[in-house]
Amino acid sequence: MGHERALARAGLGPVAGCDEAGRGACAGPLVAAAVILDDRRSGRIAGLADSKTLSAAKREALFNVIMDKALAVSWVRVEADECDRLGMQEADISGLRRAVVRLGVEPGYVLSDGFPVDGLTVPDLGMWKGDSVCACVAAASIVAKVARDRIMIAMDAEIPGYDFAVHKGYATALHQRRLKELGPSRQHRMSYANVRRAARLHSS
């Protein structure tokens, strides 16, 4: 939490970290999360790292610890049709901005993974590999990933046949086969070329 502590010492705390999950998927929502940690209140959370480097079981365990110990946590869904309408970059920024606003605690500074979050009323900084070097961004990465995985597992029951619980909406070989067999569902992002190809195949 070196970056967070430095900002707090400069009078810019509390510091929120934000990140998303599902940007590269061709189905399902993008989920954006924001987290404010407070190690003075509840101690440091061991094991925080980029969610992509952790097993599903480890992410779930850390999610529960984050929810218990963080000063504030929020996440929002940006649905597939909104991703199509806005484009992924703007959908990403919009989701992160909403997640920060919904924290319930106004941060003094916001750190994000990769690029800054335009439109905030507080200063912010996009950090290269922020989910690997900032504890609050890593925590947001884990929250976003776990929340989205749970959404995709539930979606698998609501829209059977696509195996959403397995591939989580990403364009794996299995998902591509299901798209070819069934065509797109209402949860697919029509702005993606592989989804449009499947739609054309099933409209001919």
UniProtKB/Swiss-Prot annotation:
<dbReference type="InterPro" id="IPR001352">
    <property type="entry name" value="RNase_HII/HIII"/>
</dbReference>
<dbReference type="GO" id="GO:0004523">
    <property type="term" value="F:RNA-DNA hybrid ribonuclease activity"/>
</dbReference>
<dbReference type="GO" id="GO:0032299">
    <property type="term" value="C:ribonuclease H2 complex"/>
</dbReference>
<dbReference type="Pfam" id="PF01351">
    <property type="entry name" value="RNase_HII"/>
</dbReference>
<dbReference type="GO" id="GO:0043137">
    <property type="term" value="P:DNA replication, removal of RNA primer"/>
</dbReference>
<keyword id="KW-0479">Metal-binding</keyword>
<dbReference type="InterPro" id="IPR036397">
    <property type="entry name" value="RNaseH_sf"/>
</dbReference>
<keyword id="KW-0963">Cytoplasm</keyword>
<feature type="domain" description="RNase H type-2">
    <location>
        <begin position="13"/>
        <end position="204"/>
    </location>
</feature>
<dbReference type="GO" id="GO:0003723">
    <property type="term" value="F:RNA binding"/>
</dbReference>
<dbReference type="GO" id="GO:0005737">
    <property type="term" value="C:cytoplasm"/>
</dbReference>
<protein>
    <recommendedName>
        <fullName>Ribonuclease HII</fullName>
        <ecNumber>3.1.26.4</ecNumber>
    </recommendedName>
</protein>
<dbReference type="InterPro" id="IPR012337">
    <property type="entry name" value="RNaseH-like_sf"/>
</dbReference>
<comment type="function">
    <text>Endonuclease that specifically degrades the RNA of RNA-DNA hybrids.</text>
</comment>
<keyword id="KW-0255">Endonuclease</keyword>
<feature type="binding site">
    <location>
        <position position="19"/>
    </location>
    <ligand>
        <name>a divalent metal cation</name>
    </ligand>
</feature>
<keyword id="KW-0540">Nuclease</keyword>
<dbReference type="InterPro" id="IPR022898">
    <property type="entry name" value="RNase_HII"/>
</dbReference>
<dbReference type="GO" id="GO:0030145">
    <property type="term" value="F:manganese ion binding"/>
</dbReference>
<feature type="binding site">
    <location>
        <position position="113"/>
    </location>
    <ligand>
        <name>a divalent metal cation</name>
    </ligand>
</feature>
<feature type="binding site">
    <location>
        <position position="20"/>
    </location>
    <ligand>
        <name>a divalent metal cation</name>
    </ligand>
</feature>
<keyword id="KW-0464">Manganese</keyword>
<keyword id="KW-0378">Hydrolase</keyword>
<dbReference type="InterPro" id="IPR024567">
    <property type="entry name" value="RNase_HII/HIII_dom"/>
</dbReference>
<comment type="similarity">
    <text>Belongs to the RNase HII family.</text>
</comment>
<dbReference type="GO" id="GO:0006298">
    <property type="term" value="P:mismatch repair"/>
</dbReference>
